[in-house]
């Protein structure tokens, strides 16, 4: 029988799709695989986002549907760690804190200290430890690289209240700080791949570098980093898939969403998936059997902020539907609609709501169904 591939998810917490070019390391590494850089996260904050990726279900369906519901993953949900463990994998994760992913399906479930741990070393040691304990079983790993979080969240929230104009007035400086942090991300990625090659498991592995959400640098008043709104800088994420079987050096900007990752990964690992899930696999594209990535007609994202103009940590109150060219946003607290032309106004500066009634009505109907069906 063909031996099963290791599956290694590596979260680059808070990494922006539009700043990938600032790291030479990232640019070099992306030549080793296929990059999707227009994947809508169903929720632009870590716990919500990860639980969608790992369960293949929207937050409204998996139980983790708000900041305060981080521990509410429904008992009956079968997610990737549970499936891979059942398939004979040795499973492990290293998290920013242990509540981020439920301790279900993991042989090793540990967390790190973002301020004192050297994650390149810590993760290399975890992989070695897993190889020793696995007794020849393949590995399913989730590694969480939190350095950007420390720089853009932990340091910023300590310094500025949500309505501190000083923060929003220095976007350039904030962006520079972000970009410097992202260079550290690239360096970590390079070190990790070097370790996998040295441990002789690179060739037998599917490696997925991804972001859970982007990070604002002061573009929107009331959002110091992410989780308050559903603009592109926080909901548009990327996934870089690396394996000797995947097409190399390809970049796709086609619209996909995070519910598609679950069926894709199961297909790549040749695991029969008879679970009913809303996502669509794009494994054939990664394997080079399809030249074009099929685009989604629309994707959804939702959030409810911890602080800011419209805090709502116990249920989502900001929603959007995004097509390849447009976005309709609904803010429930002020009962406000926004409509953006993503082609001519990629930074979403001009609310065009009311300018294209036919399209708006059609998208409103679909978005309302998504909002009300919970």
Name the predicted role of every residue range.
Residues 1-374:
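Catalytic domains that recognize anionic headgroups
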